[in-house]
Amino acid sequence: MVAGYINYSPLSFFAGENNMTTEEIFTGISTHMIIGVMIHKELADYYDFMSLAKYEKIQSKQYISESKSLRKLNRYFITRFSKLIPESRFEIPSVIPKDIYKHKSDDLSPMDVRQAVKRTLEMWVDWETKTKKLYEESYAELISNGDIGSALYISELIKDVDEELVEAKTLLMKNQHTDFDVVKIIEDQD
């Protein structure tokens, strides 16, 4: 069984764009955050399915935290600009492989768990790396546009994602050092 994928590039919002408006920047960030919340929900469900309680708790915490951040982002934009952030279309992320839905938890082999943990941790690090880059580019664009207040708001998001990225990279590295040994993964859940 193979972990899913995320077919989305947050940086596509800035591809070839110069002098984006604050509204366009916030639309890109909002869309990215919505997808991020969906990813953390799927990761939490997937880890719960594999009986990986610690990893499930980490992702549930991120799901709640990022849901709050998304709400704060919308509130910030509404109170500062008296407008709603426009909606945009996006592909729903696929984290849990479709064939998993045909199985029960006890159908999983140790190799299935090993591969799933490896791919999902790599996916998480990749996602948060892209998130940090998006926020940094958004910050720079807002500064360039003279919207210092919004840039300072985005700088708080950069700090948050930087902390999450450290956590994700540490967990990935810890598992890489043991070559994603399933016994070690299970022991780490206590």
Residue ranges and their predicted role:
Residues 2-190:
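Iron-associated oxidoreductase/ferritin-like identity signal
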